[in-house]
């Protein structure tokens, strides 16, 4: 049987984030996902999910703070930021009983060394997967299509499979 989750980052966006959980339940969803839940303390988020009878099935790790940032995973100069933010996300996910965390790669440009970026991303994902395993949180990779996300590092399923197999 198919199960659907509402993405409360986008649905019901005329109300606050916590209210979107109840709105999702009212619309018949038993699960939600959210890209940026971190403004809500984890205890409040957990209580809101329980009150609505809804499961948080996926959150995104913080993707950086710069305009156009779509992840921290490929940058040699941001490894400590990647680890700090990913650890925060894994702990938050565990605190709200969310077992899946999407970790974004990042944007490339004409100066990006793609082989170097792949090595850094692979190492970062391996680090995140090990930490996630200790907290019961699975790390997910999502290739983004290059038409809507030009310059995003991870654009092909085969590329994601190759990275996972290398880890």
Regions found by a protein language model. Name each.
Residues 65-75, 109-114, 146-150:
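A short acidic, helix-capping loop that chelates divalent metal ions and anchors anionic groups
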Residues 75-78, 82, 114-117, 121, ...:
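Residue-level preference for long, well-ordered alpha-helices that form the structural scaffold
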Residues 34, 58-59, 98-105, 136-143:
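Short beta-strand segments at enzyme active-site cores
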Residues 14-17, 42, 114, 149-153:
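Alpha-helix N-cap/helix-start motif
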Residues 89-114, 118-121:
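Hydrophobic alpha-helical segments and helix pairs
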């Amino acid at each position: 049987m198919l199960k659907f989750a509402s993405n409360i980052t986008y649905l019901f966006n005329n109300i606050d984030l916590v209210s979107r959980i109840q709105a999702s339940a009212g619309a018949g969803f038993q699960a939600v996902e959210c890209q940026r839940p971190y403004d809500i303390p984890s205890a409040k988020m957990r209580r809101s999910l329980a009150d609505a009878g809804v499961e948080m099935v996926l959150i995104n790790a913080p993707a950086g703070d710069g305009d156009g940032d779509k992840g921290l995973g490929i940058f040699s100069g941001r490894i400590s930021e990647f680890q700090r933010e990913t650890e925060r996300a894994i702990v938050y996910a565990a605190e709200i009983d969310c077992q899946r965390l999407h970790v974004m790669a990042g944007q490339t440009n004409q100066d990006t060394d793609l082989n170097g970026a792949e090595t850094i991303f692979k190492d970062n994902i391996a680090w995140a997967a090990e930490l996630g395993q200790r907290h019961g949180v699975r790390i997910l990779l999502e290739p983004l299509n290059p038409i809507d996300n030009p310059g995003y590092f991870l654009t092909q399923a085969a590329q994601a499979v190759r990275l996972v197999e290398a880890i």
